């Protein structure tokens, strides 16, 4: 995602920048993941660069497998200010540990796949002895 160059952007612009549908952006707002944003004279949502940066972080948490319930909890703590720094650090540390375990698990899976691919390539490269039916 890129930073907003003007003061505010619409929900459609944020959707295009982030790849998140307007419906999902409204859902995140209703769930407290995104804070309620200001509205223009026309009643449309107006997102500021800070909102874009926060959404980018939320999407990173989501991409790394943090459940929405935990993201919501983190957003609630964030909204309470600096007095919640330690609980936020703890949440992120726990999530980082889970992520490291998942990375290790996926790395092991990738090694198994690599071994299987190597075995198949050896079989493909090895000349096959003709069978009796093929010789006839």
Q: Can you annotate each of these PLM segments?
A:
Residues 1-6, 80-136:
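C-terminal regulatory/oligomerization modules of transcriptional regulators
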Residues 1-73:
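Basic helix-turn-helix/winged-helix DNA-binding cores
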Residues 72-82:
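Short, charged, low-complexity amphipathic alpha-helix
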Residues 30-31, 44, 55, 77, ...:
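Generic secondary-structure boundary signal with a strong preference for alpha-helix termini
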Residues 59-62, 78, 95:
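Alpha-helix boundary/capping residues
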